[in-house]
């Protein structure tokens, strides 16, 4: 899909300054999508297989909408982009557009944490971030905005997936800058040391501080900052990054690097 990074130029795609810009841009995207989602209650029913009756289907409403969205978007090349990873790869179809000519940017790998992202989103992130609406229970299909909530979920999940899997670009860039160091760590199979080598605690703290400021700023009506109240729980957004987004990104980076030597002169 459209991106601030020129993925047709491998050198630009692996420039850490460009990657950082894209990750900051994705913070905006994720925050705005979450603000849209918290207009609605949790609506647990839409995550239960069969909770909403769908003809000839036994999956949840959210999974159904996510799968069919990916099916449609695959026709316009979304998943030909090296920074996009589907939750339902078997649903993808042949694009109606001619393929884009992407250079080889990433080393061949099969790292995909979408199932974990989806599980954490449904079980942990949403319950923490969705308002209680006076503690009311899910009132059912005819009284709740199930379709709108699930549509927002699709946008949130796709943005989170893209942000987390962008760790591959970070890992490849770091590998190319410190090849000898990472080759030794990879050959030793030392995931802990690799994790420490890719971690910058100061940068992570800046990310969390910036994200909290964005959630507070974007979630406040500038015309009525005192009367309107926050649109989203700032702490919950920050906690989401601290507990899930950053750790899962590092899992992607480490597992990508563990496969980085396959088929190379270092294998």
UniProtKB/Swiss-Prot annotation:
GO biological process, one term: aromatic amino acid family biosynthetic process
Record: residues binding L-tryptophan: 145, 147-148
GO molecular function terms noted in the UniProt entry: chorismate mutase activity; L-tyrosine binding; tryptophan binding
A GO CC annotation given for this chain: cytoplasm
Residues forming coiled coils: none
Keyword presence, Transcription regulation: no
UniProt pathway: Metabolic intermediate biosynthesis; prephenate biosynthesis; prephenate from chorismate: step 1/1
Classification via Pfam families: CM_2 (PF01817)
Induction: Not induced by histidine starvation.
Main location: cytoplasm
Domain spans labelled Chorismate mutase: 7-262
Catalytic reaction(s) noted: chorismate = prephenate
Entry superkingdom: Eukaryota
Keyword Amino-acid biosynthesis among record annotations: yes
UniProt activity-regulation remark: Each dimer has two allosteric binding sites that can bind the regulatory effectors tryptophan or tyrosine. Can bind either one tryptophan or one tyrosine, two tryptophan or two tyrosine or one tryptophan and one tyrosine, which differentially affect the catalytic activity. Activated by tryptophan and subject to feedback inhibition by tyrosine. In the presence of both tryptophan and tyrosine, the enzyme is in the activated state.
InterPro entries assigned to the protein according to its UniProt record, in alphabetical order: Chorismate_II_sf, Chorismate_mutase_AroQ_euk, CM_AroQ_sf_eucaryotic, CM_II_prokaryot
EC code: 5.4.99.5
Function: Catalyzes the Claisen rearrangement of chorismate to prephenate. Acts at the first branch point in the aromatic amino acid pathway where it steers biosynthesis towards phenylalanine and tyrosine, and away from tryptophan.
UniProt xrefs under NCBIfam families: CM_pl-yst
Protein name: Chorismate mutase
Lineage per the UniProt record: Eukaryota, Fungi, Dikarya, Ascomycota, Pezizomycotina
